[in-house]
Regions:
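Conserved substrate/cofactor phosphate-moiety recognition/catalytic segment
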Residues: 22-59
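Glycine-rich phosphate-binding loop used to anchor ATP phosphates in small-molecule kinases
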Residues: 48, 52-118
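Hydrophobic anchor at the beta1->P-loop junction of P-loop NTPases
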Residues: 5
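Conserved lysine of the Walker
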Residues: 13
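A glycine- and Lys/Arg-enriched "phosphate-lid" helix/loop adjacent to the NTP-binding pocket
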Residues: 87-159
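P-loop (Walker A) phosphate-binding loop of NTP-binding proteins
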Residues: 8
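Post-Walker A alpha-helix
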Residues: 16-17
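NTP-dependent small-molecule kinase module
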Residues: 134-203
Length: 203
């Protein structure tokens, strides 16, 4: 069972990944954060946006190929290659930080790559309102996230909703984090596991 977990910054992807990997005795695959372009990007976003996103895309492709070649029965991936393209690269393009030519090139590479790797058996989407995201970001206390702009989170939420409702074509499990706090109520994890197994059993 290959399960990928998607959602905005602060939605609880890493926490859910950790919980599910313990439940299934599986290995977790987390987002690559060591990007050599990150410092340059924050100093000059429009100059380095394309290189930043291409590096993340390449890292995600390699991670996906490597993890699927292990033959492990259960695999859980924190954030997906689809979010790189449809959420973050698209947002940089819409903000004018990535040129249309660079974005078109990026999407060609993305489309070629995703045609060569399988979709997750189930994509879990953690839907969360801005107040929930902000609360969880503050609770985990990462210094570089403490002043994150709520307008930025809102734009990303809009892109996530559009992607989930209009673009993504695989099997999907949506969890409303405003209602289902699986940290406060562990019984919700039992329900999520049952839903995962039901969905993967479907032909």
């Amino acid at each position: 069972m290959y399960v990928a977990i998607a959602g905005n910054i602060g939605s609880g992807k890493t926490t859910l990944t950790e919980i599910l990997t313990k439940r299934y005795g599986a290995k977790a695959y987390y987002e690559e954060t060591d990007n050599p372009y990150l410092g340059d990007f924050y100093n000059d976003m429009s100059r380095w946006a394309f290189q930043l996103q291409i590096f993340f895309l390449g890292s995600r492709i390699k991670q996906t190929v490597d993890m699927l070649s292990t033959g492990d029965e259960n695999i859980f991936q924190d954030r997906t290659i689809y979010e790189d393209a449809h959420i973050f690269a698209d947002n940089l393009h819409k903000m004018g930080l990535m040129t249309s030519r660079d974005f078109a090139t990026y999407m060609k590479i993305f489309e070629l790559s995703t045609n060569l790797i399988p979709k997750p058996d189930v994509l879990i989407y953690l839907r969360a309102s801005i107040p929930t995201l902000v609360s969880q970001i503050k609770r985990r206390g990462r210094e570089y996230e403490m002043n994150i702009d709520e307008g930025y989170l809102s734009r990303l939420n809009e892109k996530y909703e559009y992607w989930i409702n209009n673009i993504y074509e695989g099997k999907l499990l949506v969890i409303d984090k405003d209602v289902d706090d699986f940290v406060a109520d562990p019984s919700i994890i039992d329900r999520i596991c049952s839903q995962l197994e039901e969905i993967t059993a479907q032909k």
